[in-house]
């Protein structure tokens, strides 16, 4: 029997239409409209994006204000802000300027509804922005204990993640004392789409600000303490190239992300965190602490910068018992250590808002990102090393030590520095550096003559060059300072000479596929249904 091709073609079209295929097919190969971000489930799963993208890094107090201003002023279409608190009047002034210069700019603001330290400032900002014509919402009070996240989405292609709020102590004026904070800017549509999906979900569940119900707060103040901090990291880092990017959110993936970082460490693990709490509660923080101790036990050199807050006595004792050095953030130049970051082997870095409390990890909304890129990680590592060298080391008998480079190779001379600033108010009689190569005997070197200026410009740092050692060698160092007949002996630390470090663990990865492959993935089931319908039609025609 001869089949009418016209009828067969019509049958195919009808089958495709029934299967829901024709309209998507037309859209796929026609002009693409601007992509609309879909409202997604609250379960934001772990995704790693392999991207070739641009990244900008900056820190507070050094260059944070200039960089944030630059990116906000660069917005052409939209700015969406999801943040715990705002008390910086200069940021509010900038938004007013943007409103005047770019009146069509789409801006939304999602603020923490019960943010500690920010209830009145947040109400004032919410009322001010509402009067300016922008929509403002509170995060849903039943979703999280605190909405402690700090991220910004610009033009649906750039995401900024902060450890700090939009506060005077996070984005200070020149010459003002402020917190140590890390921030990162990621320019990539796919990565930003992930953050936008979180924003859309939280925004959709948010509560509209109402001045009558919520109040109007108190005007923001411009006061701040002066500082002599020289801002050595005022220049932002600019990086472009391939990198793995993993967005991190509480309560969804924060614990997974923190443990991934710590468990990935093979040579060095550097952690900067405001505090530890929930110690001994058998919760998320205990898992983090256990992972840190396990890293030390498997041969990783661990450093921790924190503050004498919350469970600091407990964590100090735990770390001392396991040979892990901890310093307290310098407060001569900084108001506080408000950073929440991890650097692993100088090649992976976590920038986030996540504190080490069970609530922050499992009950808050928090936001961050893991970047696997050596250049980016090394930029933050330089700042960590700076903070390490000026930290209060009373937990280590007031004697601190470190070296450069962090992970030397077999061809690298190693410069070891003893930091004596805690004891410098008294004349030092002797500074000694103990060195043990591998499992050999200790050698002790007097370095009282090898003195140079500390970061604060005082003659209180002592150094010794160690010759290069074979790949795989572990060099143990221990600094000692004598004042009169009293010796102050620091903790032993291990320099790990490595020409290479093993690859990182594999994670669930999202990559970009070509248009045809993505089309087949999205619509393959409909194509199959259409083909089946055509075959059935042919069989039916033959039977007739």
Residue ranges and their predicted role:
Residues 284-290:
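Charged helix-capping and loop-helix junction motifs
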Residues 29-74, 85-263, 290, 298-374:
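HKD-type phospholipase D/PLD-like phosphodiesterase module
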Residues 29-41, 390-402, 409, 496-519:
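Low-complexity, Pro/Thr/Ser/Gly/Ala-rich linker/spacer regions in secreted
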Residues 394-505:
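Glycan-association/targeting regions that enable binding to alpha-glucans and other polysaccharides
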Residues 197-205, 370-395, 495-504:
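A recurrent domain-boundary module in secreted/ectodomain proteins
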Residues 1-37, 418-420, 433, 479, ...:
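Secretory targeting signatures
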